[in-house]
Amino acid sequence: MTQIPTIKQVRAFTLKGGGADYHDQSDGHWIDDHIATPMAKYPEYRQSRRSFGINVLGTLVVEIEDSAGRVGFAVTTGGEPAAYIVEKHLARFLEGARVTDIERIWDQMYLSTLYYGRKGIVINTISGVDLALWDLLGKVRGEPVHQLLGGAVRDELQFYATGARPDLAQKMGFIGGKMPLHHGPAEGEEGLRRNLQELATMRERVGPDFWLMLDCWMSLDVNYATRLAQGAQAHGLKWIEEALPPDDYWGYAALRKNVPTGMLVTTGEHEATRWGFRQLLEMGCCDIIQPDVGWCGGITELLKISALADAHQALVIPHGSSVYSYHFVATRHNSPFAEFLMMAPKADEVVPMFHPQLLGEPVPVNGRMRLSALDRPGFGVELNPECALHRPYTH
C-alpha cells in the first residue's frame, strides 16, 4: 500500500496589486468607476469603490508543503488578517495530518472558528487553505483537480464576460455580457433613467440575442430593484444580479416574485457555506446561485452547496475565481457555463483573471476553453516569482 504523505508546514503570505484581490487596480480601471455600491448613499464614496476601502485587504497566499517537499498553494482575498488566522490558528489542524484528510481538516477549521467566524474573512481564509490542499493533493497524485472531483462532464467550458463593454465581449466570442450598474437609489429618478438608458444603448449595440445582465453589487432595495427589473424587461435583460444586501433573504424572495416573467434573479457572491446557501434556496430567493469558491468555503464546501442547489433545481454559476472555479464547473451538470472577469483596464481584451500573480493561468479563446487547458496537476498554475511575497506572521 502506498504511504500517504503528511503535511509538513503551512505558510501564509500577503501580496498587493491585482490578482485575487481584483479590486486592487490602478487609476482608470473600469472596475473602480462610478459603480452602484451600498456606500453610494454617501456622496463622498460614490465616485470610486476604492474610496471606501474595497482594496484594503489585498491577497492572501497559502502554501502547504508535504513530507516529500511538494507544495500546494492557493490565492484568495484577506491579506494580513487572514495570514494571522492561518499561522496562529488554522495551521495546527494541518501540520502532521495526511494530505488526504481534507474533509476532517475543513470541519476542524470551521468548528474551531465558529465563535468569531462563520462568514466573511474567516471563511475566505478557510477557503484559501482548502484550495491549497486540493492543489497539493493533485500534485501528489499527478492529476488535475477536476479529476479528483470525479471527472469532467464536458469537454469544453463556455463563458460569459463581466466588464464595462459587453459589446466588445460579444466580438470576442462570449455568450453574454454582464455590466456594472452605475447608479443606485441615492441618485434618484435621474439615476434610474440613466441605468435604463445605458442598458438600452448596449442592447442596440449587441442585437436581440446576446445575453445582457446587470451586476448591482448589493446596492439596491426591493422597490428600486423591482422598478429597475420592470424597466429593463423592454431591453431583454437576462438576469439582475446581487440586487440586495446578502443578508436580506426576505427581500430576495419578494424580488423574485416581482420581476417580469422570464427574468432571472441571481445572487450568492457574498454568501458563505452550505447553511447560507440553504437559506437562499429554501426561501426561493433566486434562480441561480453564484458562490465564489475563494470566499464560500473552498472546493470542499462548494461541492455541498452545489448538491443542495441541484436538489432545488437551481444552477450554480460560480463568481469569478479563475482556475479554482474552472475545475469545479467542468465536473458539475448544474454548472453549464462560467464567468470570466474582464480584467483589462478598459475591458477591451482577454487577459488572465489573476494576472500578474499566477503563471500558466488559462483564458477563454473565442469565449470557450477546452478541457485540455486544465490538464496539469492540481490547479495547473504557479506563483509568479516576480511578485514579492511577504510573510507577516510565523508559528
UniProtKB/Swiss-Prot annotation:
Site-annotated residues for Transition state stabilizer: E339
Site feature: Increases basicity of active site His: D292
Cofactor: Mg(2+)
Binding of Mg(2+), residues: D215, E241, E269
InterPro entries from the UniProt entry: Enolase-like_C_sf, Enolase-like_N, Enolase_C-like, L-Rhamnon_dehydrat, Mandel_Rmase/mucon_lact_enz_CS, Mandelate_racemase_C, Mandelate_racemase_N_dom, RHMD-like
UniProt EC number: 4.2.1.90
Residues bound to substrate: H23, R49, E339
Keywords: Lyase, Magnesium, Metal-binding
Molecular-function GO term, any one: L-rhamnonate dehydratase activity
Entry note: cofactor: Binds 1 Mg(2+) ion per subunit.
Transmembrane region(s): none
Catalytic activity from the UniProt record: L-rhamnonate = 2-dehydro-3-deoxy-L-rhamnonate + H2O
GO BP term (any one): amino acid catabolic process
Annotated signal peptide: none
Residues the record marks as active site: H319 (proton acceptor)
PANTHER family noted in UniProt: ENOLASE SUPERFAMILY, MANDELATE RACEMASE, MITOCHONDRIAL ENOLASE SUPERFAMILY MEMBER 1
Subunit organization: Homooctamer; tetramer of dimers.
Family recorded in the similarity comment: Belongs to the mandelate racemase/muconate lactonizing enzyme family. RhamD subfamily.
Note: Reaction proceeds via a syn dehydration.
Function field: Catalyzes the dehydration of L-rhamnonate to 2-keto-3-deoxy-L-rhamnonate (KDR).
Protein name as it appears in the record: L-rhamnonate dehydratase
Organism: Delftia acidovorans (strain DSM 14801 / SPH-1)
